């Protein structure tokens, strides 16, 4: 495995560990999620370019579309929660609260 793939895999792992460690605040979770999506995009693009599999050139573009939708929904949810509660804690998203 080339060193660039190892570095991108380490970036994905670091973003995943950041997501697990800083899961109490929504903004840090969204940033870690974006880091994971970016590393997945770069890794999938490198794999497609190395294997020259022409039928899957659309996959990185679809991944970017889903990442943009995820970011937009996440930021809208962050604005809604911060306007309602004044905090960005994920514990405010509990649907069982009355």
Curated annotation (Swiss-Prot):
Its EC number is 7.1.1.2. Pfam families: Oxidored_q2. Gene3D superfamilies: 1.10.287.3510. Coiled coil: none annotated. It catalyses: a ubiquinone + NADH + 5 H(+)(in) = a ubiquinol + NAD(+) + 4 H(+)(out). GO terms for molecular function: NADH dehydrogenase (ubiquinone) activity. It is an enzyme of class 7 (translocase). One of its GO terms (biological process) is ATP synthesis coupled electron transport. It is a multi-pass membrane protein. The keyword Metal-binding does not apply. GO terms for cellular component: mitochondrial inner membrane; respiratory chain complex I. The chain crosses the membrane at residues 2-22, 29-49, 61-81. The keyword Transmembrane applies. Keywords: Electron transport, Membrane, Mitochondrion, Mitochondrion inner membrane, NAD, Respiratory chain, Translocase, Transmembrane, Transmembrane helix, Transport, Ubiquinone. It is found in: Mitochondrion inner membrane. It comes from the Eukaryota. Core subunit of the mitochondrial membrane respiratory chain NADH dehydrogenase (Complex I) which catalyzes electron transfer from NADH through the respiratory chain, using ubiquinone as an electron acceptor. Part of the enzyme membrane arm which is embedded in the lipid bilayer and involved in proton translocation. Belongs to the complex I subunit 4L family. Core subunit of respiratory chain NADH dehydrogenase (Complex I) which is composed of 45 different subunits. This is NADH-ubiquinone oxidoreductase chain 4L. It comes from Microcebus griseorufus (Gray-brown mouse lemur). The gene is MT-ND4L.
């Amino acid at each position: 495995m080339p060193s660039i793939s190892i570095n991108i895999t380490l970036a994905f792992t670091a973003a995943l560990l950041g997501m697990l460690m800083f899961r109490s605040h929504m903004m840090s979770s969204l940033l870690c999620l974006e880091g994971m999506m970016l590393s997945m995009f770069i890794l999938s693009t490198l794999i497609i370019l190395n294997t020259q599999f022409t039928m899957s050139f659309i996959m990185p573009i679809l991944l970017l579309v889903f990442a943009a939708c995820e970011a937009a929904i996440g930021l809208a949810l962050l604005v809604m929660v911060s306007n309602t509660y004044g905090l960005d804690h994920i514990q405010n998203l509990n649907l069982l609260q009355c």
